[in-house]
Structures are given as C-alpha cells and as structure tokens.
C-alpha cells in the first residue's frame, strides 16, 4: 500500500460518547453504512451513520468500545456490514457479523453480501393471496397467515410467544419442507442456547439458521442483526427458490435498539421517548419481507407490548405492516388454554371468502359470534349462576366451552414439559371438528375430552385429561 492510499483509508478517533464515535478523515469521508475498524486488534467495528462536515463522520459501534481513546487510528474497510449466504450456513448459529457462535468452524465457501439491500421491485412481487398453513388449529381457522406476509405475535412477558415461534419452526420443516431462519433480537443467552438444543433434539436443525444479537450486546448490534437475518432469507428465496419462514423475536427490541441509538446520536425524541425515525427504520426491515415469483419469505414476529398497552407507538407502528395479528392473552394463559391466543382480539386480512372459501369463512364468523356471546354472558354467570340463563343460552355456553377446549393443542416443542405428544392438525380436520361441535355431536362428552387433543377423533381417548 502506498503512502497516499494509506492516509486516504485511515482516520483518527476524534470523540467517544458511549457507543457513538466521531472519526476525523483528512482526505475523504467514507460513505454511509461503511464499516470502520479500530482498536488494538481492529476488534471494534463502527458503522458510519452520518457525515458531520467535510472532515468528520459519526458512527455507532457494533461492538463494545472498551479500550478506545482519542487519536487512535481507524481503518476504512470500504465495505458495508455483510452476512454469509449459501447452503453451508444451514444448521449454524451466527452473530451480527456472520461469525459462528456455536463453537464450530466458519462455514467454508460462503458468499458475503451487504445487509443494506433494496426490497424487491413491485414487478417481481406476486399479487396472489395464498394461505400459509401452520398445523396449529386456532391460527389456521380464525387468523390464517399469508404466504409471503407478516404476522405479529402480540403479548406481554410470559404468555408463550417464544414457544409458539419454536413450534412454527418445527411445523415449517415437517409440513412445507422449507428453510427457517430464527432472528433473536435482544435475546437472552439462555433462550438462544435452549432453542439451539431444542431444534437439534427435534431434528430440524439441518433446515434452519439462527442469528442472534444478544441482550448484552451494544444497541448497534441489536439494531442490525435483523437485516443480517433478512439477507440470508433473501438468498434462499431468490437464489435457491425456496419458501422461507423468518421468525423474529422480538421486533420490539429492534425498535428499542433504534431508540437507544437515536438518543445517543442526539436526535429529538418523539412520543414516549421513541426515535422520530421509528416508522422509516421499521419499514426498511418490513418491506423486504415479500413473496416473489420464485419463492416467499413469510415472517412471524413476536411483539412485546409494554405494560400490555396496545396504544404504545411501537405496537401501533408494527400493526400497520402486518397481514395477521395474533394476540396472546395473559388471562387465557392463566386459565390453561394454550396456545393462549385470544380469538376475539386476533385477526387476519386473509379471512375473506374469495381467499379461504365460503365454508371456512362462514364457520370462522360463526365461531367468533359464539365466543363473543359467551364472553358477554360470563358476567351474568358469575353473578347469578348458569342456571339463571335460558335453555338456548345454556346450549350456547356449552358449545363455546367445548370450542375453547378443542382449540387448545399440545406442541411438539413442549412434549418434555407436558408429557403429551405434540399434534399437527390439518385445516380440514379442524373445520370438521368445529362443525361437529357446533352441531352438538359432543354434547354428551365431558369437556375435558376435547382439551389438548389434535382431531376430534381423539376425544374418546382423552377423557382422563382434566381441563381447566
């Protein structure tokens, strides 16, 4: 390297404030999103976010800044943050830089692609609406997911979001034979290790990739790990022509990391302290999730709702991108109904007769009506007792209670905890079971016989299981 090129590629640290680092370059300024390296062994990675003037840039450190000092040399790599792509990354676990964190050797012969990419143009996108069948009764029946769409799992802490996501991975591999990519944003180290071991024990690790920006890592790492996972998903969709299930846990922590960066960059906060660019940043991630003529990326995103407040700006902005929303209820979880999805608070734009068919559409409306009427009658039952209802209302309550129990389901990923073998149920079997319950074919069966089963044919075998 000649002297001129050396001076052109190197700058000096001018200022350090937490994870925000200002760097001075004498001859040129690196473009936005360029990765800079500094530190004793170039272990500190900085992404350029803005150019302050003709000599200074301001960037966010994607690693810890311990050991940095003013006037330290900074290398302009000339490249953006990149992620490895290729079939060799299957069954592996990576960090935001594409480095293995599963104690294995780096995968050989991978291609590296920049994580900052444009969404597919409208001309390449498929306009056909297709249902993505999950094998989970309450989702496929009442809130069907869209192939190439985005679904949100809304709920507070401890209601089963992560368990539901891991079950989706299992069913994706066994039902659709596609690729699953799990992106952990702000995940606890323990949860990542448990997921890795669960997927390995379930035999689905060979068809999935895991990418983590862990809770203890700087906000820059948590803010970019979603783009790294999405870049990997785009490879399987566009180059391998496969369907991809992208699971993000938790999209709120992506927004939270952006809020931390915004504060450190000195931006004026908006409502409730969120960054003013939250809508734009979320759109840059969400708009790349789409289906094309060659494949589809279907995304399911866990959304932590602060204090269970669905008017929180993070929840509101996320809602606008979703084709389906699955709301997990703490009350239902407390009553033992798992998955704890609230059928009256969840919904999907796919529930139209032109998409799911008239039979499915009419049945879903009838079930919602029965469950809504039962919800209204609960206060009367609590005050006066079931005997004070009319005969017709008592029949309605019995149907609703049987439907609630039938829509529970044992999961493969929780077999070791529940002792009940997991079930994957087809949509036709779910529709058939609900229609038979509404026709009172199981009026003489105890409610417990319908609790935690797959198809209604198992009702006789499950009489010993006690429902809540």
Swiss-Prot record:
It is found in: Cell inner membrane. ATP binds at residues 155-162. Pfam families: ATP-synt_ab, ATP-synt_ab_N, ATP-synt_VA_C. GO terms for cellular component: plasma membrane; proton-transporting ATP synthase complex. PROSITE patterns: ATPASE_ALPHA_BETA. It comes from the Bacteria. Keywords: ATP synthesis, ATP-binding, Cell inner membrane, Cell membrane, CF(1), Hydrogen ion transport, Ion transport, Membrane, Nucleotide-binding, Translocase, Transport. It is an enzyme of class 7 (translocase). The gene is atpD2. This is ATP synthase subunit beta 2. Belongs to the ATPase alpha/beta chains family. Its EC number is 7.1.2.2.
């Amino acid at each position: 390297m000649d002297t001129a090129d050396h001076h052109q590629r190197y700058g000096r640290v001018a200022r350090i404030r937490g994870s925000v680092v200002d760097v001075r370059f004498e001859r040129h300024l690196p473009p936005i999103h360029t990765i800079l390296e500094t530190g004793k062994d170039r272990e500190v990675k900085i992404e350029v976010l803005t150019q302050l003037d003709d000599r200074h840039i301001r960037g966010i450190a994607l690693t810890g800044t311990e050991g940095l000092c003013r006037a330290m040399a900074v290398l302009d790599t000339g490249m953006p943050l990149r992620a490895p792509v290729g079939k060799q990354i299957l069954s592996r676990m990576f960090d935001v830089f594409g480095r293995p964190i599963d104690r294995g050797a780096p995968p050989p012969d991978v291609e590296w692609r920049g994580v900052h990419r444009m969404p597919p143009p409208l001309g390449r996108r498929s306009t056909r609406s297709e249902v993505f069948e999950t094998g989970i009764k309450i989702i496929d029946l009442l809130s069907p997911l869209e192939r190439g769409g985005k679904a949100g799992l809304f709920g507070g802490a401890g209601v089963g979001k992560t368990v539901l996501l891991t079950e989706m991975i299992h069913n994706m591999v066994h039902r659709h034979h596609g690729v699953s990519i799990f992106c952990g944003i702000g995940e606890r180290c323990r949860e990542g290790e448990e997921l890795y071991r669960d997927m390995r024990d379930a035999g689905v690790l060979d068809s999935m990739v895991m990418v983590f920006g862990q809770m203890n890592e700087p906000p820059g790492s948590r803010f970019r790990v979603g783009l790294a996972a999405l870049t990997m998903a785009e490879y399987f969709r566009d180059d391998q022509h496969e369907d991809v299930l992208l699971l993000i846990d938790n999209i709120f922590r992506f927004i939270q990391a952006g809020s931390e960066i915004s504060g450190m960059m000195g931006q004026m906060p908006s409502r409730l302290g969120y960054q003013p660019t939250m809508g734009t940043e979320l759109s840059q991630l969400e708009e790349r999730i789409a289906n094309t003529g060659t494949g589809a990326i279907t995304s399911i995103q866990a959304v932590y709702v602060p204090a269970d407040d669905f008017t929180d700006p993070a929840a509101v902005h996320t809602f606008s991108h979703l084709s389906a929303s699955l709301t997990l209820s703490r009350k239902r979880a407390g009553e033992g109904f798992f998955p704890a999805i609230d059928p009256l608070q969840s919904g999907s734009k796919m529930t139209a007769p032109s998409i799911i068919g008239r039979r499915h559409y009419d049945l879903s409306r009838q079930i919602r009506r029965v469950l809504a009427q039962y919800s209204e009658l609960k206060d009367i039952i609590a005050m006066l007792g079931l005997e004070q209802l009319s005969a017709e209302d008592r029949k309605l309550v019995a149907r609703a209670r049987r439907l609630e129990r039938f829509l529970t389901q044992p999961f493969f990923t929780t077999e070791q905890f529940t002792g009940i073998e997991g079930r994957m149920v087809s949509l036709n079997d779910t529709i058939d079971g609900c229609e038979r319950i509404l026709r009172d074919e199981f009026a003489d069966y105890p409610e417990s016989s319908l609790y935690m089963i797959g198809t209604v044919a198992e009702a006789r075998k499950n009489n010993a299981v006690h429902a809540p």
